[in-house]
Amino acid sequence: MVYASLGKAIEENCPEEYVEQAIQNDPNSLNAVDDDKRTPLHWACSVGKVNTIYFLLKQPNIKPDEKDEAGWTPLMISINNRSVPDNVIEELINRSDVDPTITTRGGQTCLHYAAGKGRLSIVQLLCDKAPELIRKKDLQGQTPLHRAAAVGKIQVVKYLISQRAPLNTSDSYGFTPLHFALAEGHPDVGVELVRAGADTLRKDSENHTALEVCPDRIVCNEFLEACKEQNLEI
């Protein structure tokens, strides 16, 4: 089968032998970019072809940190793809030619994505490698803790709290991590945030507290009851 490019071939799940032969025939294809500015490594990470990822990373001239049109690196794509296991992502992070502090066009970092996906071991490694990312805001003013709280990733929330992530930082809409936790229906996360010192009276840009943006009475009651049981002041 004939493919338009090596990246397209990987996207369409070509045999692994094809990748090796293509690079032997044309070494420049290793880092060639398509119309989306994606390299073959971007596509291998996108479709979760682990053996191909390893093969590409072993090539001496590989450029593993290129940005695509949206500013995404192969590392970012891997973190967002559940079919790419943690050990592959860890290898990318530990490479000297990969910068985990790169941001997308939206200002997100790898830690934003790892936190939002609940990939605790990756969150821990990124925090060790680049602790400044813990406080990094994207263009919407959101930190990794905002991301983790919004999707209910409580183990990541606990870890970020232990690393002194800012609890009461507001995004561009005035939402704190606590606002997100309750608005998205995660009372257990809300309790963890309050236990750590989150301000329950902080208001968003429309003058609403976290409890006031909680749309579900059951969630609100679970949160209030748990706080009461643990003698947490609201």
UniProtKB/Swiss-Prot annotation:
SMART domains: ANK. ANK repeats lie at residues 36-66, 70-100, 106-135, 140-169, 173-203. SUPFAM superfamilies: Ankyrin repeat (SSF48403). One of its GO terms (biological process) is proteasome regulatory particle assembly. GO terms for molecular function: protein folding chaperone. It holds the Pfam family Ank_2. One of its GO terms (cellular component) is nucleus. It comes from Schizosaccharomyces pombe (strain 972 / ATCC 24843). The keyword Repeat applies. It comes from the Eukaryota. InterPro entries: Ankyrin_rpt (IPR002110), Ankyrin_rpt-contain_sf (IPR036770). This is Ankyrin repeat-containing protein C6C3.08. Keywords: ANK repeat, Repeat.
